[in-house]
Amino acid sequence: MASKPAVSVSISNLYPGCENVSVRSRSMMFEPSLTKGVLEVFSPVTTALSSVDDLATRAIEIQNSNINGVGDFSVWEFSGNTVYHCCYDYFVANDPTAIHLILFSLEEPYEMQLSQATYWLNTLKALTPPQHNIAFGGRLQNPLKVVLVGTHADVASLIRGPGGEFCYAKEKPLLKELRNRFGLDLQLSERLFVMDTGASNSKDIKLLRSHLLELRNTILSTCNPMSGLMERLVATLPSWRKLTGPNQLMSWQQFLCDVQEHINPLVSEDHLRGVAQQLHSMGEINLMQSETVQDVVLLDPRWLCSGVLARLLSMDTPKAIHHYRGRYRVEEIQALAPESDVEELLQVLDAMDICARDLTNPGMVDVPALIKTNGLHRSWTEEEEDHDVLVYGGVRLVPAEHLTPFPCGLFHKLQVNLCRWSHQHHTGDDAVDEPPDGDIRLWTNGVKVSQGGAEAMILLVNHGQGVEIQVRGHESERAKCYTLLDTMVTISESLLSSTLPGLLPARYYLSPQQLQEQHGPIMVYQPKDFLRAQTQGESSLSNTMGGYRESFSSILAFGCAEVYNHSRQGRDIHISQVSLLARRKLCRLLDPPDALGKDWCLLAMNLGLTQLVAKHSSNLSTTPTNESPATNTDPSPSTSPTAELLKDWSVRPDSTVGVLMGKLRELGRRDAADFLLKTSPVFRVQVEGVVGGGRAGLGGIRPHL
């Protein structure tokens, strides 16, 4: 049994009921709305599934509480066990009326403190969807509010200042580093709050409470006051929860009808949606939306978070053999939630990408978060006699901006999506407790699928910092190999954009020859390698690890001329293919006025868009240049001139990545050109020109909540 870290007395005094939460590294979120709010606590500490702690938080525990001197809150406490993280994206950052606290222990080395804070800040940033209308400087109109808290100051033997508060020597470099990385994406508080773990009435605690109260009051000042309808709904919800039955789920239309029938027959749907959003912010209900489960109202979040998810994903679940593969019988799911309608429950869990129903065997359900089988299939088998006639290729998806792991739980969701894809595209007569033979195999941090003579392995690599997709097949099936790789990459990138809409991924390519030789480490080619080679008129790249060159065709298309000849590469790809997040970053770089004129204005003239200069120049004198969200409170920021420039320029057929990159270098903006070089797409296929290629079979991908 794992030992339990010491609990901070001061943090326990901040709100009651948190005595079973480690404060080594975690994040809390206060969501004040009207008279209440939500406090969320979660930790990045990875706990082995075999480690059981009777006092540990299971899934998400919710309680109402009062923070002394601040106000009433609904406290959401998230388990640090990563098995539960596959559901956190629906609750962690789904409301703008929030204050997030990221806590880390000052006992840890500085590098660990920076790593832990970066992980959580990157998670919050990744969960924030981008705005389609990009504001000046790429600013967000309502960035999440974040407070950094260093704990165990007394244990770390920090000295006190003249006012009695702790002084941390590395506070300024830590805040500077984090602000440089996230200051334009999140509203970071101006200081690091350093906590004394043994003094609940210390000045440090009082400063933190005062800051929380200030933030809370600011948020409440922008919220609508509690209406009579809301007061009646808050009073009525407890009785509705009792009448709803075993599942605390209700369709939006039924919720609307009940409100009109029992509370106010004149209430409109639009007005009720606003009230429901406020109830959502208060933690009274939770609104869940999906194209498969339309507008579901979760009447009691505790039922799902503290009940169903805690039992389903618990490490105490019986350890039958098939459970090590993450597969359950529907009857076992029913036993974990005996009072629930299991079919209705599975629809919601399926829409949340927590489980996947096996269409070839409807009595079985895949729950990848519970897989305990280790990497038995992390490399290709070597039993094929025709090994030399196989072709290989691969892609690695990584976060483009910050070298940090993907948020925990992402790969479990990817496994769910791949299970769903496999179930929808294949049939089999396998045994009840076995996955379809040859179609899909799952293990911890890995998946293996096959289709049409090609097979793929999808792996979580580099300590969670990359998702790697390797594909191989017979050399006579090169187009099918490309199709399978394209399908797997598309599923992965679609999941990233829906689950982590604020995370910008980059696509790297793996050396096909080294994959065939099965020798590591594998050479990884980045977008900049292809674009630089194109600029020099080359169509191959140097593998410095292997001592040879590899052609674009072999790296990008398995050497298939049918695919490669109907594609565009790097510099020739149209600017409209550059992602919204990449455009937003360019706006941050080019919008602020430059002393030498090397900004959007001169770029517009170089691109022949002089009409935009007069249109937007009048806004420059009143628009902040490069302020962080913490200091810039303009409620209606002006439109980004760089975004308008790219929008107008993209209507031209000759507006390519290569042209823009050249203009940026002529302008002397190497920073913007290098960023474009780093994140631009490398390869685009005109699907209609490829027989059997392109994105075949993608019709089975399910939308996400």
Task: List each model region and its residues.
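Extended, non-catalytic interaction/assembly segments in eukaryotic proteins
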Residues: 1-72, 79-90, 99-594, 601-602, ...
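Alpha-helical bundle protein-protein interaction modules that mediate dimerization/oligomerization
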Residues: 606, 619-704
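Alpha-helical structural elements of signaling/regulatory helical domains
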Residues: 267, 595-596, 652-655
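A general alpha-helix detector
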Residues: 254, 258, 585, 599, ...
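Charged, amphipathic alpha-helical linker/scaffold segments
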Residues: 583-634
